[in-house]
Amino acid sequence: MESPLGSDLARLVRVWRALIDHRLKPLELTQTHWVTLHNIHQLPPEQSQIQLAKAIGIEQPSLVRTLDQLEEKGLISRQTCSSDRRAKRIKLTEKAEPLINEMEEVIGKTRDEILSGVSKQEVETLLHLIRKLEQNILDLQAKD
């Protein structure tokens, strides 16, 4: 019987995320917070919520709850866009910058520990396969 690849990948993501959540707990953040802050930090300044949701790969309503939490923590600010009152622009606060550096350290160290014993070539092969599978899925979705 073949391995249930989808289940295996889902389980890997779950345990990886749980470890990240555990390691970010002292910073009072979660993996979801990190992904959101990381993307805000990487994107050009004052992106809209729509652009951020696309960059992360989630629906905008799913993003709003996380943004509410980050705003409550004083890590981001949201302002109504002057050209489109329905759109909100997102900006990191000064309080977020040092925290992002701490988070990146935690994530980097955790990633290195997870990948210990895995060669650079194995990681490159895995990334290649993931991209290939993702493209196959996107192609199938486009056909449906």
Curated annotation (Swiss-Prot):
Keyword list, A-Z: Activator, DNA-binding, Repressor, Transcription, Transcription regulation
SMART domains per the record? HTH_MARR
GO BP terms: namely: response to stress
- Note the InterPro entries from the entry: HTH_MarR-typ (IPR000835), MarR/SlyA-like (IPR039422), Tscrpt_reg_MarR-type_CS (IPR023187), Tscrpt_reg_SlyA (IPR023071), WH-like_DNA-bd_sf (IPR036388), WH_DNA-bd_sf (IPR036390)
PROSITE patterns documented for this protein = HTH_MARR_1, HTH_MARR_2
List the transmembrane segments.
none
Signal peptide as annotated in the record: none
| Span of domain HTH marR-type | 2-135
Q: Which residues bind DNA?
A: 49-72
One Pfam short name: MarR
> What GO MF terms are annotated?
DNA binding; DNA-binding transcription factor activity
Q: Sorted alphabetically, which NCBIfam families does this protein's record hold? A: PRK03573.1
- Give the family this protein belongs to, as stated in its UniProt record: Belongs to the SlyA family.
Q: What does this protein do?
A: Transcription regulator that can specifically activate or repress expression of target genes.
Assembly and partners are described as: Homodimer.
Q: What is the designated name of this protein?
A: Transcriptional regulator SlyA
> What species does this protein belong to?
Klebsiella pneumoniae (strain 342)
